Amino acid sequence: MTVIRLTRIGRKKKPFYRVVVTDSRKRRDGGWIESIGYYNPLSEPKDIKIDKERLNYWKGVGAKMSERVEKLSQKA
Protein backbone atom coordinates (compact mmCIF):
# COMPACT_ATOMS: atom_id res chain seq x y z
CA MET A 1 0.00 0.00 0.00
CA THR A 2 1.21 3.51 -0.77
CA VAL A 3 1.39 5.97 2.13
CA ILE A 4 2.20 9.65 2.59
CA ARG A 5 4.33 10.17 5.68
CA LEU A 6 7.25 12.05 7.21
CA THR A 7 10.86 10.95 6.86
CA ARG A 8 13.46 12.47 9.15
CA ILE A 9 16.56 14.23 7.88
CA GLY A 10 18.80 16.76 9.59
CA ARG A 11 21.30 16.46 12.43
CA LYS A 12 21.10 15.03 15.91
CA LYS A 13 18.66 17.08 18.05
CA LYS A 14 17.86 19.28 15.01
CA PRO A 15 15.04 17.46 13.22
CA PHE A 16 13.87 18.36 9.73
CA TYR A 17 11.27 16.28 7.93
CA ARG A 18 10.37 15.59 4.31
CA VAL A 19 6.80 14.75 3.36
CA VAL A 20 7.20 11.74 1.07
CA VAL A 21 5.17 9.15 -0.79
CA THR A 22 6.45 5.65 -0.11
CA ASP A 23 5.47 2.01 0.20
CA SER A 24 4.15 1.16 3.67
CA ARG A 25 6.60 -1.76 3.98
CA LYS A 26 9.66 0.51 3.74
CA ARG A 27 11.51 1.72 6.82
CA ARG A 28 10.87 5.28 8.02
CA ASP A 29 13.95 6.67 6.27
CA GLY A 30 14.04 4.05 3.50
CA GLY A 31 13.58 4.81 -0.17
CA TRP A 32 10.62 6.87 -1.30
CA ILE A 33 8.73 7.40 -4.54
CA GLU A 34 8.30 11.19 -4.46
CA SER A 35 9.02 14.05 -2.08
CA ILE A 36 6.05 16.43 -1.98
CA GLY A 37 7.05 18.85 0.78
CA TYR A 38 8.91 19.51 4.01
CA TYR A 39 8.33 20.43 7.66
CA ASN A 40 10.74 22.28 9.96
CA PRO A 41 9.49 22.08 13.57
CA LEU A 42 12.32 24.21 14.99
CA SER A 43 11.72 27.45 13.09
CA GLU A 44 9.33 30.06 14.46
CA PRO A 45 6.73 30.00 13.04
CA LYS A 46 6.96 26.33 12.11
CA ASP A 47 7.85 26.07 8.41
CA ILE A 48 5.47 23.80 6.48
CA LYS A 49 5.35 23.40 2.69
CA ILE A 50 3.28 20.73 0.95
CA ASP A 51 2.55 20.63 -2.79
CA LYS A 52 -1.27 20.43 -2.68
CA GLU A 53 -1.55 19.41 -6.33
CA ARG A 54 0.71 16.37 -5.86
CA LEU A 55 -0.93 15.56 -2.49
CA ASN A 56 -4.36 15.46 -4.14
CA TYR A 57 -2.99 13.33 -7.00
CA TRP A 58 -1.57 10.71 -4.64
CA LYS A 59 -4.74 10.68 -2.52
CA GLY A 60 -6.69 10.19 -5.76
CA VAL A 61 -4.71 7.08 -6.68
CA GLY A 62 -5.28 5.55 -3.24
CA ALA A 63 -2.39 6.67 -1.02
CA LYS A 64 -3.22 6.94 2.69
CA MET A 65 -1.88 9.79 4.83
CA SER A 66 -0.36 9.34 8.27
CA GLU A 67 -2.06 11.13 11.17
CA ARG A 68 0.74 13.70 11.45
CA VAL A 69 0.68 14.50 7.72
CA GLU A 70 -3.11 14.97 7.87
CA LYS A 71 -2.70 17.55 10.66
CA LEU A 72 0.16 19.31 8.86
CA SER A 73 -1.70 19.44 5.54
CA GLN A 74 -4.55 21.31 7.22
CA LYS A 75 -2.09 23.94 8.50
CA ALA A 76 -0.18 24.32 5.21
Swiss-Prot record:
GO terms for cellular component: cytoplasm; small ribosomal subunit. It comes from the Bacteria. GO terms for molecular function: structural constituent of ribosome. Pfam families: Ribosomal_S16. InterPro entries: Ribosomal_bS16 (IPR000307), Ribosomal_bS16_CS (IPR020592), Ribosomal_bS16_dom_sf (IPR023803). One of its GO terms (biological process) is translation. Belongs to the bacterial ribosomal protein bS16 family. HAMAP family: Ribosomal_bS16. This is Small ribosomal subunit protein bS16. The gene is rpsP.
